[in-house]
Amino acid sequence: LKQCIADAIMTYGVGSTGSRRLSGNHQIFLDTEQYIANWVGKPAGVLFNSGFQMNSSIFSVLADKTTLIVADKLIHASLIDGIQNSDAQLVRFRHNDMDHLAQVLKKYAHNYSEVIIVCESIYSMDGDTVPIHDIIQLKNEYNAKLIVDEAHSIGLYGVGGNGWINEQGCLSDVDIVLVAFGKAFGLSGGMLLSSQDIVAKMRAKC
């Protein structure tokens, strides 16, 4: 890894020289994004300098005042920061409590044009896993989007380490997958994996 990084620096330099929409959209970024997207199984992806930057910036692109975000009580603090940076309404449900999630959705979802559910696949504090199939059932019932943070499972679970969601066989039911490179990969950075449309918005606005 050290040698690959050194070689890339000598070839591409260390500065982006501009935003992704201008001079900062290098081919090596596009190739890396597509390689990882193919590996995980999503159509496209966008890289971030860090997992924190990713988590704290994406919701201002994804959500507005007509959006309800329903988040597990134990998601990472940077995700909460990102949600609070947006104009969305945040309601949190008790950790892994599907009955409480159902109550929250029943009470609030009809007041908003879009609903986003946010959880982690494996939670960092206790190492427990999300009841993903139950969440997907509620997601479908309320026509919500589902964002799953795989920071603590990517590289450890799934075929070749492609994530816990893949291991559970439900990747197609997850709208956005978030991965971080600071854990199993031993690097830095983060990546959002989703549809071509969502990734294009991220490249344009983040």
Describe these PLM feature segments:
Residues 2-51:
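Conserved N-terminal alpha-helix of the aminotransferase class I/II PLP-enzyme fold
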Residues 65, 85-87, 142, 173:
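Short, structured coil segments at secondary-structure junctions
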Residues 91, 95-148:
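Active-site phosphate-binding strand-loop segment of PLP-dependent enzymes
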